[in-house]
UniProtKB/Swiss-Prot annotation:
InterPro entries, per the entry: Aa-tRNA-synt_II (IPR004364), aa-tRNA-synth_II (IPR006195), aa-tRNA-synth_II/BPL/LPL (IPR045864), Asp-tRNA-ligase_1 (IPR004524), Asp-tRNA-ligase_1_N (IPR047089), Asp/Asn-tRNA-synth_IIb (IPR002312), AspRS_core (IPR047090), GAD-like_sf (IPR004115)
Gene (name only): aspS
Protein name: Aspartate--tRNA(Asp/Asn) ligase
Marked site: Important for tRNA non-discrimination: 31, 77
Gene Ontology molecular function terms on file: aspartate-tRNA ligase activity; aspartate-tRNA(Asn) ligase activity; ATP binding; nucleic acid binding
Subunit structure, as described in the record: Homodimer.
Catalytic activity: tRNA(Asx) + L-aspartate + ATP = L-aspartyl-tRNA(Asx) + AMP + diphosphate
Species assigned in the record: Thermobifida fusca (strain YX)
Domain of life: Bacteria
């Protein structure tokens, strides 16, 4: 073998041992004829002392080398407590260059700011940086733990196809041409949803998979066209069973990766309550500043803007001290989110109200507003008025922005909860109904017989798991009865013929005694991001793509040649069936 020890594993009890190490030159320092090298491998860094100049004469940063030498205790006063090998050093007797390195496009040591484009272009170099390497190791540890949890709870790991048929799941499919059947296409799965339900029909009962999913979505920050999720499905269960396995997984991960003990059972909050209090279905509970509804308070207001179906407010502590430019910036912030603006009132130190909105309020409203919303002298009150959901969402986003700007968020806290009683349907762009989760989600038991009569108020047996403001898992109890499934299809405007064309294989399977079943999927990239203490999922993916879906490393996506296009049958039109 090339080496006898890993560099980062050497300690004082290795003193006087002869060792052979291999790794990269992380740093070189010359001191009066003696050269000090920081030798790095995957295990860490060790200092190598080179007393013969010819051994290190040609060495440069990131040369890959093999070092033969003797471990010794560092001279007193030269210890380095910042590294695990800081008590010792290796005195080199021989150095072999295994491979040389070209000049680096960016430094790998220190805290220099490096553009993300450069990091992704040279991802293999970025991985040599401790922060990137540690994030990937956290992902590996978390993956191992997840497999242990699922195995300990009797789950069977089953791989589902990556080449399947296109089915409507809310986003566009990535399509793959079939060379042997010109004009026909596979689709890469947006999720294994249909296959995992078929596994329940097949009697597997407890299935899980760490799987890749593919969605051809519009460009969005911190989204990837391919991503990983832990997919779980169980037969003969209700919501409590799904909550139980989800909590077992999350508590074990937080305990073993971060040393954090999450109390069980996790908190639960209905969707409607989350929207009313926080303006979002993924509330960050690490700080307060809850929304306050003022619809009744302004029921008789002379201010036309507040004569709306919903009026709400959120308080910004100390916000009255903002400059006019800062307050104007809030308006731009709101407009960037599709709102007309963000009305505000400033609470002066004497308790009087200022700002453009204050003069439009009645004397009674001005007198009682601060107390109603819990504002103190020096605070600012932001308002949103209009349609309920849109107004709440704007205030929810403002609340989060306030938390960040005012330093209200406890970055050391871990707040997790289940959001339950999710809406079953929502309006689409054409004014029809569409499923919020997917069309196989079961309705709440109290509306099981009537949901089709009033889709807008129907709730589903669906839930999300939220941690620190991030949705990390989503699940539901599924429909397993044909009559109920058809009513859902009818509600979303899917005819029997269309349903048969798109989901016929699943509907056929449901004729053979399907069990009651349910499941959930965990967004693995985002969960690992939190576990690793990173701010973007790109930092916990080995070879991520940019927000525009590009891969700076390989140059993907790329055009294909005319020959590839012809051979794949990209332009072929399938023969139409004749009657």
């Amino acid at each position: 073998m090339i080496r006898t020890h890993e560099a980062g594993t050497l300690r004082a009890d290795h003193a006087e041992q002869n060792v052979v190490l291999a790794g990269w030159v992380a740093r070189r320092r010359d001191h009066g004829g003696v050269v000090f090298l920081d030798l790095r491998d995957a295990s860490g860094i060790v200092q190598v002392v080179v007393r013969e100049d010819e051994l290190a004469h040609d060495l440069r940063s990131e040369y890959c080398i093999k070092v033969t030498g003797t471990v010794r205790i560092r001279p007193e006063g030269n210890e380095n407590p910042d590294i695990a090998t800081g008590e010792i050093e290796v005195v080199a007797s021989h150095i072999e260059v295994l491979s040389e390195s070209a000049p680096l496009p960016f430094p790998l040591d220190g805290n220099q700011e490096i553009s993300e484009e450069a990091r992704l272009r040279y991802r293999y170099l970025d991985m040599r940086r401790p922060e990137t390497a540690e994030a990937l190791r956290v992902r590996s540890r978390a993956t191992y733990i997840a497999h242990e949890v699922m195995n300990d709870n009797g789950f069977v790991y089953v791989e589902t196809p990556y080449l399947t048929r296109s089915t409507p799941e809310g986003a566009r499919d990535f399509l793959v041409p079939v060379r042997l059947q010109p004009g026909h296409w596979y689709a890469l799965p947006q999720s294994p949803q249909l296959f995992k339900q078929l596994l329940m029909v097949g009697g597997m009962e407890r299935y899980y998979q760490l799987t890749r999913c593919f969605r051809d979505e519009d460009f969005r920050a911190d989204r990837q066209p391919e991503f990983t999720q832990i997919d779980i499905e169980m037969s003969f269960v209700d919501e409590e069973d799904l909550f139980d396995i989800g909590e077992k997984l999350f508590t074990r991960l937080l305990r073993e990766v971060r040393g954090v003990e999450l109390p069980r059972p996790f908190r639960r909050m209905k969707f409607a309550e989350a929207m009313d209090r926080f303006g979002t279905d993924k509330p960050d509970l690490r700080f307060g500043q809850e929304l306050v509804e003022l619809t009744d308070f302004f029921a008789n207001t002379p201010f036309r803007v507040f004569q709306a179906p919903y009026v709400g407010a959120v308080v910004m502590p100390g916000g009255a001290s903002q400059t006019r430019r800062e307050l104007d910036a809030w308006q731009e912030w709101a407009r960037s989110r599709g709102a007309k603006g963000l009305a505000y009132v400033l609470v002066h130190e004497d308790g009087t109200l200022g700002g453009p909105v204050a003069k439009n309020l009645s004397e009674e409203e001005r007198a009682g507003l601060a107390e109603r919303v819990g504002a103190k002298p020096g605070d600012a009150i932001f308002f949103s008025a209009g349609e309920r959901t849109a107004s709440q969402e704007l205030l929810g986003a403002a609340r989060l922005e306030i938390g960040k700007r005012c330093g209200l968020i406890d970055e050391s806290a871990w707040e997790v909860l289940w959001i339950t009683d999710m809406p079953m349907f929502e309006k689409d762009d054409e004014g029809g109904w569409t499923s919020v989760h997917h069309p196989f989600t079961a309705p709440a038991q109290e509306v099981a017989d009537t949901f089709h009569n009033d889709p807008g108020s129907a709730t589903a047996r669906a839930f999300d798991l939220v941690m620190n403001g991030y949705e990390l898992a989503s699940g539901s109890i599924r429909i397993h009865r044909a009559e109920m499934q058809q009513r859902v299809f009818d509600t979303i405007g899917l005819s029997k013929d269309e349903a048969e064309t798109k989901f016929g294989f699943l509907l056929e399977a449901f004729q053979f005694g399907p069990p009651p079943h349910g499941g959930l999927a965990v967004g693995w990239d985002r969960l690992v991001m939190l576990l690793a203490g990173q701010s973007t999922i790109r930092d916990v993916i080995a070879f991520p793509k940019t927000a525009s879906g590009a891969d700076p490393l390989t140059g993907a996506p790329t055009p294909i040649t005319a020959e590839q296009r012809r051979e794949a049958g990209v332009d072929a039109v399938p023969e139409q069936a004749t009657s």
